[in-house]
């Protein structure tokens, strides 16, 4: 019997609701941050933010519909 695991890809978000920036970070930064949320891999994308692959569904990712970046808490 096989087990199906749901995974998603997307931009990591910080506590402030903004995409996790990587412009001034070392090359391995995004891959390390993605693995912290059990993602399989990640890189610094053209928007200069960390993009992760194969993260579990519970991991928070940036979504334009629910964007809270810069809106305060």
From Swiss-Prot:
The signal peptide stretch is: 1-7
Where found? Secreted
Q: Which GO terms describe its biological process?
A: defense response
Quote the CDD domains the UniProt record gives. neurotoxins_LC_scorpion
Cystine pairings recorded for this chain = 18-69, 22-44, 30-50, 34-52
Which family, according to UniProt? Belongs to the long (4 C-C) scorpion toxin superfamily. Sodium channel inhibitor family. Beta subfamily.
Put simply, this protein is called: Toxin Td9
Task: Please name the source species.
Answer: Tityus discrepans (Venezuelan scorpion)
């Amino acid at each position: 019997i096989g087990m199906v695991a749901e995974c998603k890809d997307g931009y990591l978000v910080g506590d402030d609701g903004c995409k996790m920036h990587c412009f001034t970070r070392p090359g391995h930064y995004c891959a390390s941050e993605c693995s912290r949320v059990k993602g399989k891999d990640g890189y610094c994308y053209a928007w200069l933010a960390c993009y992760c692959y194969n993260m579990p569904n519970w991991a928070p990712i940036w979504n334009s519909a629910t964007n809270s970046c810069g809106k305060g808490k």
